[in-house]
Amino acid sequence: MMLASIIEFSLRQRVIVIVGAILILFFGTYSFIHTPVDAFPDISPTQVKIILKLPGSSPEEMENNIVRPLELELLGLKGQKSLRSISKYSISDITIDFDDSVDIYLARNIVNERLSSVMKDLPVGVEGGMAPIVTPLSDIFMFTIDGNITEIEKRQLLDFVIRPQLRMISGVADVNSIGGFSRAFVIVPDFNDMARLGVSISDLESAVRVNLRNSGAGRVDRDGETFLVKIQTASLSLEDIGKITVSTNLGHLHIKDFAKVISQSRTRLGFVTKDGVGETTEGLVLSLKDANTKEIITQVYQKLEELKPFLPSGVSINVFYDRSEFTQKAIATVSKTLIEAVVLIIITLFLFLGNLRASVAVGVILPLSLSVAFIFIKLSDLTLNLMSLGGLVIAIGMLIDSAVVVVENAFEKLSANTKTTKLHAIYRSCKEIAVSVVSGVVIIIVFFVPILTLQGLEGKMFRPLAQSIVYALLGTLVLSITIIPVVSSLVLKATPHSETFLTRFLNRIYAPLLEFFVRNPKKVILGAFVFLIASLSLFPFVGKNFMPALDEGDVVLSVETTPSISLDQSRDLMLNIESAIKKHVKEVKSIVARTGSDELGLDLGGLNQTDTFISFIPKKEWSVKTKDELLDKILDSLKDFKGINFSFTQPIEMRISEMLTGVRGDLAVKIFGDDISTLNELSFQIAQALKGIKGSSEVLTTLNEGVNYLYVTPNKEAMADVGISSDEFSKFLKSALEGLVVDVIPTGISRTPVMIRQESDFASSITKIKSLALTSKYGVLVPIASIAKIEEVDGPVSIVRENSMRMSVVRSNVVGRDLNSFVEEAKKVIAQNIKLPSSYYITYGGQFENQQRANKRLSTVIPLSILAIFFILFFTFKSIPLALLILLNIPFAVTGGLIALFAVGEYISVPASVGFIALFGIAVLNGVVMIGYFKELLLQGKSVEECVLLGAKRRLRPVLMTACIAGLGLLPLLFSHSVGSEVQKPLAIVVLGGLVTSSALTLLLLPPMFMLIAKKIKIN
């Protein structure tokens, strides 16, 4: 009664309904324009990073002195999921992941409280703290500074001109500086002169520190005015620093008496090279969590344009990575597909209905339903991305279905009875099928509930897709019984109408087939179930995967060399690699390689680890057909570089892999234990085992040994005899090698560290280090070798920990087979061939974890959804057998999807699972339409056989229209090769394949099966 009242109200108040529709279009358009746009939904976890630096410390010292104390404080935080860390030379990165229910600001407050309590107990000189509020996908914009200025000047320009301006943009978390040289004022002492004059490193450090600060002395009043008194003691230039006095036993000396003061660079932990030409400086814009990427990048371009007049002559800012380009391509793919689908659907409507007015009446629901979806997307704080817009592409056919049923029925009633008033005829026709339409849409919505329950990365990725579908369907639900009856009353005519050529042709084919199936019900039903069982037996032979790889366009070539490589050797190697690629691969537009660590410490790499960003010219200009061929061509150009590990990834893919497991790769095998040597040996064995498995690609384990360490162990008794303290010894050695930072002073717009450091060639020879001598308190030069033991040892590049345990990781990508079967085989091979020592254990991580979690969730929730739909069908038809008969569409729909996946070599993935869910809804909806009409005819007093034959023929058009519209809506996805189409293609394959078998069941098997049931039970 309520549905009939809504229809009646809409037809009586047509002006109000039309005004409401116009308002929906207006607010929908507004929401579409003002909703943020991004490539993907925000899939990042609630994550807090702590970056701490202690210059000159080895990985083991960083682990023992910083990471372990922090772990004791940070483990067991409320809502914490995991705590992992990596310690390298001079720096540690601690990452804490929280449950998604924990607010990021609350998480940071919790971490900050614990961090503050432990920081005071950490060694003197520890720098850093919590990283900015960024996510693993915050790298949205990268550029280099090129031109005829020095690398120090480039870095100064980036750090103190460009970076402050870009950080002012709303949504920018920070701008990371990579490469170049950071300027420092360096005091270069002559140790012989210092010994002769009786000056120690501590004396020099104290004198410099005192003289680098101005201070205030108070206020002075004169004639009613106040003057603030400032004592100008700070030395702010090289000349001023040279004039600083140092007190000694021989009197007061100037620094320039025993040292030079020069402008040099600080010790570097990394560098950036470009196109094989030389070094450059890179800027990396990081976005805040939940920020509008497109808007940020637009403002970044505007700000860079404003800065152009202030750049030195001949200097340019060159962008080599812009996330918005990928976003625009992905959105363009979905938009193009959406437009193509709408065009195909409108053509299909006209072919089936043969009436332009009826086609218009149906087509009205599309812009209105999409507008409703955009309004809810905006209200839900979602973004317009590949998944949310992709959901609308998937839903496009389903949005039309209910309108098709309403208009088609009204069209039939008006054509059959021209004597009844048009409004009354439309009211009766809409009332007749209102329950079926509403229950059909509700059924489809219920089928998408399982997607809304997904957890983890797969939930964040696919929930927006399901949400946009549900929003659009809710719009359709209301519009089908309000605006569609009104539009039908305005555009349809009460005139007789003959069938179109297409429907006559289809009826001629269908009628004899239907007769055969109805006359031989038992034989055809038996044959159908044999087909069903045979088709379902394909399931074990269809591979399983989490998600198809998405082509981002640009690639990242990861390069890993021997851990002991020096900075200069690493730089020369990368320049040679870039030159080789540029020489042999003409499709490469630019190469930017970054080696080592960045300024913020968000991307810790050793001097042996390089991420090489490679951009290509337009694909139409390539000499090869596919991207895989192009990547093979790049690897072929590098065949002369022996002993180096090369592997390919993509900018976003790389960060997602790191986010999931802390490393890159489809599969990550984590080995936990205490001894680094044992972990290294086990990693090597597992890597060899994985290489023997079919489908393994780019199997790598981190080269975690082979770094040369020079252990200097002071003899405290010997030092006491000559009057040298441990603190003085440490400061001396640090000043002789890396440099001892004393303070930071303002120099114009920049801030420059002042440090004590010996000539750089001291660090170039172990012999020279052994010959170093420091001044005792008696003014005597004491060789280091006489008071300390110096030995060369091998040590780790880094120490990785997870949940307070050391670990090593072996990673592998998978090509040519599905991920699920590869992981199962890998587990079996490792269990058979790798013997673990006591207290050592292995875990597996990577993309397959998401798939397993999704499968587990869906295997629980989908049966519950089917049960819910059974109850909806039962309350609709008041019959358990009829409800079960309609649900029989589901397994037959599955068979078509499985056959289609098997035929084209696609895997069962989360997108394919979404396709099956969409398919279930369409299949059940068709069953509802068919069985509902059979029941209606039966209640009119017709015989069972007459009901089946007449009803099936009359419902041929709506069933085929529904299937064709749903299929054609997805057809553009099947043939699209644009950015982002890889994710949607498995879904389209499943739906198109399943529509064939489910439509065949609806049209050919449901009639005889209904006939058998109706003859045995009474249908009310």
Residue ranges and their predicted role:
Residues 62-133, 192-213, 234, 568-663, ...:
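Solvent-exposed, membrane-proximal periplasmic/extracellular interface segments of envelope transport
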Residues 2-37, 431-433, 499-548, 588, ...:
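Signature of alpha-helical transmembrane segments and their immediate interfacial
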Residues 396-410, 433-453, 460-498, 612, ...:
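Transmembrane alpha-helices and their membrane-interface boundaries in multi-pass membrane transporters
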Residues 9, 40, 51-53, 119, ...:
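Extracytoplasmic/periplasmic membrane-proximal domains and adjacent transmembrane bundles
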Residues 19, 58-65, 101-110, 139-142, ...:
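Solvent-exposed, non-transmembrane alpha-helical starts
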Residues 15, 22-61, 117-123, 451-461, ...:
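Transmembrane helices with small-residue packing motifs
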Residues 320, 327, 331, 407, ...:
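Helix-loop junctions and hydrophobic alpha-helical segments within the transmembrane domains
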Residues 28-33, 343-412, 453, 471, ...:
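Hydrophobic transmembrane alpha-helices and their membrane-interface caps
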